[in-house]
Amino acid sequence: MTTILVAADAKWVRDQVRSAFMSRGQTVVEVTRGQDVRDRFAEVNPDLVVLDMQIGNMGGIAVALDLRLEESGGRLDRANILLLLDRKADEFIGRRADVDLMLVKPVDAGVLRRAAKQLLPAAS
């Protein structure tokens, strides 16, 4: 079973991700606040984390940095992180946050599934 953790305060972003991964053998877990990602990650140990760049007071960049710091401290497993950008120019900061893949919103279900396949070869 593949578990995808999506963090976005915008319902339409969470809906896009959920619709892309609504298939047998896949579970989508949602959080609406960036500060909740670390705890939820520890609970579900997802195969993929999808972060919206703009999430309230702790955005996707800060969350990605937090996950990488927790990983380097041995407190969390390595996370495959897909960052959803607002514009292509944001790729610079995404690279600084050590995310695995970036996509510019809006993205459709097919694009999200192809991105997941790049990060998770066994994902369907």
Question: Can you describe what each PLM-predicted range is?
Answer:
Residues 47, 51-69:
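Conserved phosphotransfer microenvironments
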Residues 117-124:
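The C-terminal output helix
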